[in-house]
Every structure is written in structure tokens, then in C-alpha cells.
Amino acid sequence: MMSLDRRRKSKLSSSFIDDIKTHIEELEKRARSRRKDDQISFDLCVEAVIADLTRSLFNETTPWLYRSMRSNSFTGNAIGFKTFRLVIGLMEAAELIVINAGGNARNTFKEPGDGAPAFHPGLATRMRASDTFKSLAIEKGFSADNYNKHFLQIKPSRLVSLRVSSSRHGAIKVNARPMQFEPTEKTEEIRLEVKEINDFLFKQKLSGGVFTGFQRIFNEGDRRDFDWNMGGRLYCLGDNNYQMMKKDARLNMKINGRRVAEVDINASWLTILHALLDAPLPLRGDLYHVKGYDRSVIKGWITATLGFEQFHTRWPPRMRKSITEAGVKMTKRMSMQRVGDAVMSKYPFLSSWPEIDIRWSRLMYEEAMCITDAMRDLRLQGIASYPVHDSLIVPVRNIGKAKATLENAYLSRLGVKCRLSVNRRGKSKAP
């Protein structure tokens, strides 16, 4: 993502940014100088774009950065939509950036009267550094090893975000767009808590992973019953943060020089749903264990179902891929219907899932509240913890305290004891 949250940090990065800024301003050929405030905004945007493009050169996954070009996606940010559009336009003219515009894609297979959508929802605009930009950056001396010496990650200023409900065009899910909201006492309370979390973690040293600061994102803000009680996860900003890493890679991180462990909540949403419906949990064992099926298949079915309003008639492609990557060969007996029958024999209340008035956003909210409650308890003990949605990463020596705070959070809020597993480098302990 082109997050626009990095700034110059050294003489080297300053000269690189200033040289490019001078060059694109010469291309612009303005008749008159910008007003002071407009020039400050322009300079800031150039700096942020160059910082992101330089970082993308050393991204092993993809050189492409994405950025929504909706004007409302810039609301509340230090850099405005018009300024951003101007800067990337000038950089494209200078052949420093390659832009792949987003937007809807025409459905070439649509036939008259077939009911299919005329367009598929498109991707956000993609951008990458051009070969010219790459040559200039490498010639200047930037590398993956020294990037953080020359560019500074700033703390996020927008700590609470709200999105409308997502929608679908046939089988294609359309990502939820940002939604504006008026600040209230409740949103200020949420904002201050996120700020407290960020301030504490920015004082810690996370090695082997990148912490960029959290934003708490709430969902389905356009629902009538929304009251800051849907979604609400802590998301680390940017596309190279520790939350985006594979679990094995995260276990190689260190917190303040100490080895880490990841404490996972076993079947978190399923546990929460049991509590909200006052349904008794099985006395022991892995909640994803159903006789005759690999764990990944049962987890996949439950995850797919609780994230949808109805029962799926076939496996979502992403879930099928996840199962096959776990080494499981999909067979005819693993249809959504047959696996569902097996799951519902263990959890009968799931047979009425489409009629239950609890949706994924409520389950996510309850989980997020338990996670933030546990983080607060650990923080008061001086212990740094880094969430990955349904798990907490802590120093190995604090595993016991992390487990105790998570168990207490679920018990206090939901009246249910969650089951935990601990993953360490070279070791794992199941619930």
C-alpha cells in the first residue's frame, strides 16, 4: 500500500527528495508560485510518495503499491486527494512512476438477459517505481539494509476508521469503502486507547518485524444498529508490517531483544458464538476436531460459514487454496454440504446459522475487545504484546501471563474460558 506515512531522515534522503521535487516542478511550468500552505502540502506529498516508492524497491513480494483514488479515502489525512493526484501525475510525466489505473472491469462474458453484472468491481490504482526511479535510488546508495536509516516511519494520526458494509456482485466481494463519522465521547475513548497502545509499543524494540502503529477499523457503519460494536480490530498500517508476515517468520522476531511466542485463541469466533448463544462448549480438546476430517477442512468450513450470512454451496476459492496448502487433497466427500453435516453433528446450533441474528462483525468486535482488554492488562504490567487478530505475540518469558490475561478477558466479558495454544520457534503446544 502507498501509505504516505514515511518521511526523510537523513541528508541522503533529503537530497534525493529535493532533486526529484525540483525536476518535476520544472516540468510543471507554473505561471505563478504556489501559496505557502499549498507549497507545504505539495512538498510533503512529494516526500511521502518518494519514501514509499523507494521502500517498494526492496519489497520481495511485489513492487506494486496500491492506493484508492476515491477522494474520500484522503479525508482526514495530512495529504489531500488533489495534491496527491497532481504529484503522481507529474512523476508519471517525468517517467519516475508507472501507474495502473483502478476502476471497474467490463464483464466480457456477459450475455443479454443472463442476469450477470456488466462490470466486475475493479482494483484500487496500482503504482510502482519506474526503471528510471530505481536506477536513481540505487545510484544514490539506498538498499534494503539501510532504508530505515534514511526514512522515518511517522506515528499514525488517524487512529479510528469506519467503513460501510461490503457488497457483492455475484460471487465477487466488493471491499467496503471508508465512511465519515462525527466524533463523539465514545469515539474519543476509542481513539485515546489506540493512542495509548501505540505510544507504549513505539517505546519498545521489535526486531525482525515492522511495527508502524495501529488503527482501529470498525465495519458496517451504515447499519441501523451500529453503535461502534461491529468489527473494531487493531490493524497495523502499511503493507510490510509484522501482521502481514507468515507465522513462522513472526516467530523469529524479538521483543526488546527477547525471543517471542505467539499465543493463539483456538476457534475464537466459534467460542464467542457459543457464549453469545449460551450454548455449552465441549469439555476439552480442539474445537476444530471432527472425526474423519483433517483439522484444516473443519476450520475452513467454520471460518467460511461464520464470515457469510448463508451456507456456502461450494468452497470459496481462497478457502480451498488454504486447505490444499495445508497438504490436504480435496475429495468428493469434502463437499461443503458433507463437511457441514459433520460439523453440525458436533455443533447442532449451527444448523440455524442463517436465522441467527449474530454476524461476523459482532464476532470480530467481541474478539477485538477481548484482545485489547488483555493487551491493557499486560501493558499495566510493563509487558509488550503485539496482536495478530486472534493471537498475541509476547516474549517467551511472559507466556504464562499472556495466557492468564486472555483467559480472564474472555471469561470476564463473555463468561467463557477460551482455549489457547502456544507457538514458539521450533515448538508448538496445542489446546
Model-identified regions with their sequence ranges:
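Short amphipathic alpha-helical interface segments
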Residues: 15-77
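Helical catalytic core of nucleic-acid polymerases
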Residues: 62-81, 241-358
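Short, hydrophobic-biased segments on the C-terminal half of alpha helices
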Residues: 85-89, 375
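A short, conserved structural fragment
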Residues: 88-110, 382-385
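Acidic, glycine-rich two-metal-ion catalytic cores of nucleic acid-processing enzymes
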Residues: 116-297, 389-391
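Catalytic palm active-site di-aspartate
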Residues: 264, 302, 384-395
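Active-site palm subdomain of RNA-directed nucleic acid polymerases
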Residues: 369-388
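Polymerase palm active-site segment centered on the conserved acidic dipeptide of motif C
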Residues: 399-431
